[in-house]
Amino acid sequence: MKKLLTIIVFLSMVLSACGLSPTATTTPTATRTKTPRITETPTLLPTNSPTITPTLSYPPGGYGPSNFPADVDPLTGLQAANPVLLQRRPMLIKVSNMPRNVRPQWGLSLADIVFDYYTEEGSTRFAAIFYGNDVSMVGPIRSGRFIDADLVQGYKAIFAFGSAYVAEMQRFNASDFANRMVVEEPYTPLKRYDPNGFDYLVVNTADLSAYATKRGINGVQNLNAMFFNLPAPAGGQAGTQLYVHYSAATYNRWDYDPVSGKYMRFSDTADVTEVGQSEQYAALTDRLTDQPVGFDNVVVLYVNHELYSPGIYDILLSGSGDAYAFRDGQAYRVQWHRNATDIVSLTMPDGSPFPFKPGTTCFEVIGLKSTVAQTGQSWRFTHQMP
């Protein structure tokens, strides 16, 4: 009876989900070969909700940036509900953000880390990294972009995506992670799901990890770099709200919720095409859990966007640069760092590691000429190239 009720609730949620389509459109993703379709509504796995370590048990010195205990997720600083999951590679899954009718997405709130970055024609896309827990459905899955090469190499991840432009696919195929790419082909775990006439590509992370193990490309990786601690560092400014404006069609807002300690995501619901026109927002939810999408840390990264060809950008996420980190209602001016084979880390102005709040992180990637304006506790970032 309980299982039947869960299925009914989830079906009701899927049937009610819809959105507005923006003026800006994205290039359709080419699919390769017909794959099996999901014929039953997926049920939530018990591991969909990561276990958070009680505050009193967190070490005063924090965890990281190296020598993480075997049961602590180095991407969240939290004890894993199932430490066995940490003996594998992370999974980087491309998740669509536009057009608006793909929202709400499945599984986005359950990722350890999410990167939100500009693609083309005013749109953004998510690179969601799953590691410390498994999620029964993630999607809709879309195509890869140049920046994904840096992310897959840094996080040593299994790379699940829909397709890519020719030049991007050539770079992926020539990389050292070419054997870790998983696309829509027969016998891969990427499946088609078709609610309300939409033909979505989705994946179960447990199936994706098992597929990597079967192919002999899974196993524990060195993911050192991030530092976590519960107390917020000194030197911050009030930062209970931030806006990230990518284009007239794609923009978002984060509101700090002192009860959960998370920044809750609000997404655009209409294009802003006229001077003086107000932005319009709605809370982003997770279609898998029907819960609001929120992250413990939100970090805005200033990164060079190099024009590769008309409409295609190569986002160069290596080296170091300026950044703003938001946690616990506070904003911090920091520096981001990433060597060619490492994950993203942050430092304070004095060079000491910036302490991420234990939990999940969303990185907003914007151009080097992007502007920032502060009004009281609210911060507004406007994306500008390069």
Ranges and model annotations:
Residues 1-16:
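Sec-dependent bacterial lipoprotein signal peptides
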Residues 1-2, 31, 36, 191, ...:
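Short, intrinsically disordered low-complexity segments
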Residues 13, 18-73, 83:
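Ser/Thr-rich, Proline-interspersed low-complexity disordered segments
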Residues 54-111, 120-386:
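A surface/extracellular/periplasmic glyco- and lipid-processing/surface-interacting theme
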